[in-house]
C-alpha cells in the first residue's frame, strides 16, 4: 500500500493533527493510501535519545533518524508540520513534564551532551535532502486580494532603522575555498605561544564542495552594541535585538549574551564577576538571570540594579507588555525571520511597555542579511505600506539540501578561548583558511556541497520556465562565499536551456529593491537564495503579501526522487495552545496542511500513476478555495469558528467536490453518501463544535499531551466522527 508519512510535532500543529488526521486518513484510504504518523515532537525526540535507559514499555524508536533515511529514498512522501526548535528553557520544561509522567530522565545539567542533540533546529536539516520551492498558492493570493489583511500605515518621519556592524563581523571576515579534490580537513586553534588545540579533528569534504570560515570580533561587537544602546536612548525609540537563537544555536545565544550585557553595562561593571561566576551571562536571557539571582545572597540588591538599568536605559521592545516580558527575556522569543516582517507590517513599529506601538532600532549585529530589512524599511518610509490587493508575489527557490551554508554550521562553531589563529588545514598540511582571532571571538565554518548547488540551479531554471517569472540569484559580491557561489551558478546555468528566461545575479540589497519595485507594480519575481535568505524571505514576503507565512506552499523535491511537503513557514504557535487551555478555542489555521496534502497526493499521481490520488488532490484544492471564499477559516475569538470547525467544513466541501467530479466514478459513488450526511447535519455539527468552546480544558500535558484527553477535546462531536470513520470501513 502506498504510504504518506504525517509528522507528529508540537504545540498548535500537534493539537490540529488530532482533529485533521482522522479526516485525512479516511479520505486517503479511498485512493489506497495509508497515512502513518511518525513522532518527531520535542518530547518524542527526548525519549528517543534515552531509549537505552528506559524500560521496554517506555522505549520509543528514533523516528527522526528513520525519516532521515527515508528521505534519501525514492519512496519518501512526507508531510512535515512545524516543530519546536527548542531553547534550553523549553528543553528543561519538556524534560520536567516527562519526568512527572513517569519517565526516568536525567536532569539537563547531568547529560548536556546527549540533550544537545534535541536543542535548536535539529529536525529540518535531517529531512531536507533536497532544495526548497516555496510559493503563495493562487487560491490564497486571490483570496487576499478580495479580503486584504490589515497593513499599518507608514510615516515619512518614521525613526525606525536597522543597526548592523558592517565590519569585523561574519560577513566581512569571510574566507572561502572550492575544494579541487575530496579531502578530510582539521580545524585547529594555534595560540600566540604556539599551543595547538584541535577544534574539529576530522571534517570530510567532497570534490567541488565550498568550505568557508569566518568570525565575529567580540571587542567590535561590544563596542557596536554600546553605541546602539546609546543611539536608541538618544533617538527616543525602542531598543530591539533580532537573532535566530533557535537555528543558530551556538553563535546566536553567545551574541544574545553580549546584547544583554551591553544593555546592562553598569550592572555587569559592578557585579559582573559574581554574575559570570554564577553562570548568569545573559546567554539564556534576562528571565534566566532573574531566576538565578534567587540563589545569590545579594540577589535582591543585584535585581534592584537590573531594575535601575531598565529604568535608565532605552525602552525595550516587548514580547508581552502585560507580563513585563521584554525582547531580552528569552533568546528564542524574538526570532528575526518572524519579528522583522511583523515590525515592517506594523508601520515599522514594535510594542512598548505601555502596550503601544513605537518606532524601534532593530539591532542585527552581523551585516550579512541586515541590508535586506533596511532596504524594505527605507522603501516603506518613502513609498508607504504595500497594498495586498495589488502587490506582486516573490516565491523562493532556496539552497538548503545537505545542511548547506550557515544552517549546518553548529558543529563547526567555536567560542575562542585564547588569542591566536584558527586554521582549516588540509591532509597534506596546507592551510586552506586562516584567521587571526582574539579571546571571546566566535569563529565558524560552513559547508555547501556541489550536488545541492547543481540541483538548486536546475530548480531555479525549472521554476522560471514553469512560472514565466524572472528569477534573481541573491548573491553578495562583498562575501567570499557568495563570490564562489556566483562562479558555480554561472558555470551550471550554462548546462541549461535558458533561452527566453530572465535570470540575473544581484546583491541582496539590490535584489530586495528590484523585487519590491516590481511588487509595487503588481509584478512577480522568484528570489533564488541561500539557506538563510530562504528562511528570511519565505517569512518576509508572505507576511507582507498574505498576512502570514503559514499560508505558503512549501515543497522540497528530494534529490533521490521522493517528496517532502512542509506546511507553512511559520512556527508552532505556543500562544494558540495557551488559548486552548484557557478557553478551548484553537485559532491555528491548517491551510498549510491542506496545501501540502494536495501536493503530497499529486506526488503519488506523478510518481506511482495513482489517478485516484490525483482526483483527491484536485478536489482538495477546489475545497480549500471554497473554504477561503466562504470564510470558514478559524477566528481568533472564542465562540466563533476555530480549527476544528474549519476541518469540518473542509471535509464537507472536499466530499462535495469528490461526489460531484466525473473523472472517477468509483470515488464519486463512495463520497455521495458522505457528502449528503455531512451537509444534512452541517448546522448541528457546526453549532456543536462552537458550543464546546469557552471553558478551560486539560490536555494532560503540554509537550506530551495525553492522546485520550486531547483526542476527546479535538474530536468532540460524535456525529461528525461517525461519518468520517465510516469511510475507513
Swiss-Prot record:
Residues noted as binding D-threo-isocitrate in the record, renumbered to the chain: 121, 124, 128, 134, 244, 407, 534
Keywords: Glyoxylate bypass, Magnesium, Manganese, Metal-binding, NADP, Oxidoreductase, Tricarboxylic acid cycle
Disulphide-bridged cysteine pairs: none
Gene Ontology annotations of biological process type: glyoxylate cycle; tricarboxylic acid cycle
Domain of life: Bacteria
Record's cofactor remark: Binds 1 Mg(2+) or Mn(2+) ion per subunit.
Reactions the enzyme catalyzes: D-threo-isocitrate + NADP(+) = 2-oxoglutarate + CO2 + NADPH
GO MF entries: isocitrate dehydrogenase (NADP+) activity; metal ion binding
Enzyme nomenclature, EC number: 1.1.1.42
Glycosyltransferase listed as a keyword: no
Cofactor: Mg(2+); Mn(2+)
Record-stated family: Belongs to the monomeric-type IDH family.
Physiological role: Catalyzes the oxidative decarboxylation of isocitrate to 2-oxoglutarate and carbon dioxide with the concomitant reduction of NADP(+).
Subunit structure: Monomer.
Protein's recorded name: Isocitrate dehydrogenase [NADP]
Gene source species: Corynebacterium efficiens (strain DSM 44549 / YS-314 / AJ 12310 / JCM 11189 / NBRC 100395)
Amino acid at each position: 500500500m502506498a504510504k504518506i508519512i504525517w509528522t507528529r510535532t508540537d504545540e498548535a500543529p500537534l493539537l490540529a493533527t488530532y482533529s485533521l488526521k482522522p479526516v485525512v486518513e479516511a479520505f486517503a484510504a479511498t485512493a489506497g493510501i495509508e497515512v502513518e504518523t511518525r513522532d518527531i515532537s520535542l518530547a518524542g525526540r527526548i525519549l528517543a535519545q534515552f531509549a537505552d535507559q528506559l524500560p521496554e514499555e517506555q522505549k520509543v524508536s528514533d523516528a527522526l533518524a528513520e525519516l532521515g533515511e527515508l528521505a534519501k529514498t525514492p519512496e519518501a512522501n512526507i508531510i512535515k508540520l512545524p516543530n519546536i526548535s527548542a531553547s534550553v528553557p523549553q528543553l528543561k520544561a519538556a524534560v520536567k513534564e516527562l519526568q512527572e509522567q513517569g519517565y526516568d530522565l536525567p536532569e539537563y545539567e547531568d547529560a548536556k551532551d546527549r540533550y544537545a542533540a534535541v536543542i535548536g533546529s535539529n529536525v529540518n536539516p535531517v529531512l531536507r535532502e533536497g532544495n526548497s520551492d516555496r510559493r503563495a498558492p493562487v487560491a490564497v493570493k486571490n483570496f487576499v486580494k478580495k479580503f486584504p489583511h490589515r497593513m499599518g500605515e507608514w510615516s515619512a518621519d518614521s525613526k525606525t532603522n536597522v543597526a548592523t556592524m558592517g565590519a569585523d563581523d561574519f560577513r566581512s571576515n569571510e574566507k572561502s575555498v572550492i575544494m579541487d579534490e575530496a579531502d578530510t580537513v582539521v580545524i585547529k586553534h594555534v595560540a600566540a605561544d604556539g599551543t595547538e588545540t584541535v577544534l574539529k579533528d576530522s571534517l570530510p569534504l567532497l570534490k567541488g564542495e565550498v568550505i568557508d570560515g569566518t568570525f565575529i570580533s567580540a571587542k567590535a561587537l561590544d563596542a557596536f552594541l554600546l553605541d546602539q544602546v546609546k543611539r536608541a536612548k538618544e533617538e527616543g525609540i525602542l531598543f530591539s535585538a533580532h537573532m535566530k537563537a533557535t537555528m543558530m544555536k551556538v553563535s546566536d545565544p553567545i551574541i544574545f549574551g553580549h546584547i544583554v550585557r551591553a544593555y546592562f553595562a553598569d550592572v555587569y561593571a559592578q557585579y559582573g564577576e559574581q554574575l559570570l561566576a554564577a553562570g548568569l551571562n545573559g546567554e539564556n536571557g534576562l528571565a534566566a538571570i532573574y531566576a538565578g539571582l534567587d540563589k545569590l545572597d545579594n540577589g535582591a540588591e543585584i535585581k534592584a540594579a537590573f531594575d535601575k538599568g531598565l529604568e535608565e536605559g532605552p525602552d525595550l521592545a516587548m514580547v508581552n507588555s502585560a507580563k513585563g516580558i521584554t525582547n531580552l527575556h528569552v533568546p528564542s522569543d524574538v526570532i528575526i525571520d518572524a519579528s522583522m516582517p511583523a515590525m515592517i507590517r506594523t508601520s515599522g513599529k514594535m510594542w512598548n511597555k505601555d502596550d503601544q506601538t513605537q518606532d524601534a532600532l532593530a539591532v542585527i549585529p552581523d551585516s550579512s542579511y541586515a541590508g535586506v530589512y533596511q532596504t524594505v524599511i527605507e522603501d516603506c518610509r518613502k513609498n508607504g505600506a504595500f497594498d495586498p490587493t495589488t502587490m506582486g508575489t516573490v516565491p523562493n527557490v532556496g539552497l538548503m539540501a545537505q545542511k548547506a551554508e550557515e544552517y549546518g554550521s553548529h558543529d563547526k562553531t567555536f567560542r575562542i578561548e585564547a588569542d591566536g589563529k584558527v586554521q582549516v588545514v588540509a591532509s597534506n598540511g596546507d592551510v586552506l583558511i586562516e584567521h587571526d582571532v582574539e579571546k571571546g571571538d566566535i569563529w565558524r565554518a560552513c559547508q555547501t556541497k556541489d550536488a545541492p548547488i547543481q540541483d538548486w540551479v536546475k530548480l531555479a531554471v525549472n521554476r522560471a520556465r514553469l512560472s514565466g517569472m524572472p528569477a534573481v540569484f541573491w548573491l553578495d559580491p562583498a562575501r567570499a562565499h557568495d563570490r564562489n557561489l556566483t562562479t558555480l551558478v554561472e558555470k551550471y546555468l550554462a548546462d541549461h536551456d535558458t533561452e527566453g528566461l530572465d535570470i540575473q545575479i544581484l546583491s541582496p540589497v539590490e535584489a530586495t529593491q528590484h523585487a519590491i519595485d516590481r511588487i509595487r507594480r503588481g509584478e512577480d519575481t522568484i528570489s533564488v537564495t541561500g539557506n538563510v535568505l530562504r528562511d528570511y524571505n519565505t517569512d518576509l514576503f508572505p507576511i507582507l503579501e498574505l498576512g502570514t507565512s503559514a499560508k505558503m506552499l512549501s515543497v522540497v523535491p528530494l534529490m533521490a526522487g521522493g517528496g517532502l511537503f512542509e506546511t507553512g513557514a511559520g512556527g508552532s504557535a505556543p500562544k494558540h495552545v495557551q488559548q486552548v487551555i484557557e478557553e478551548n478555542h484553537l485559532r491555528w489555521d491548517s491551510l498549510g496542511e491542506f496545501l501540502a496534502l494536495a501536493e503530497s497526493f499529486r506526488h503519488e499521481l506523478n510518481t506511482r500513476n495513482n489517478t485516484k490520488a490525483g482526483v483527491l488532490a484536485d478536489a482538495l484544492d477546489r475545497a480549500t478555495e471554497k473554504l477561503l471564499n466562504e470564510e470558514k477559516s478559524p477566528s481568533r475569538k472564542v465562540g466563533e469558528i476555530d480549527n476544528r470547525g474549519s476541518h469540518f467544513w473542509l471535509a464537507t466541501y472536499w466530499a462535495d467536490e469528490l461526489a460531484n467530479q466525473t473523472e472517477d466514478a468509483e470515488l464519486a459513488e463512495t463520497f455521495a453518501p458522505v457528502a449528503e450526511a455531512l451537509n444534512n447535519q452541517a448546522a448541528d455539527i457546526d453549532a456543536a463544535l462552537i458550543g464546546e468552546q469557552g471553558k478551560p480544558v486539560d490536555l494532560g500535558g503540554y509537550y506530551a499531551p495525553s492522546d485520550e484527553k486531547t483526542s476527546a477535546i479535538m474530536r468532540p462531536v460524535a456525529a461528525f466522527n461517525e461519518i468520517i470513520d465510516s469511510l475507513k470501513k
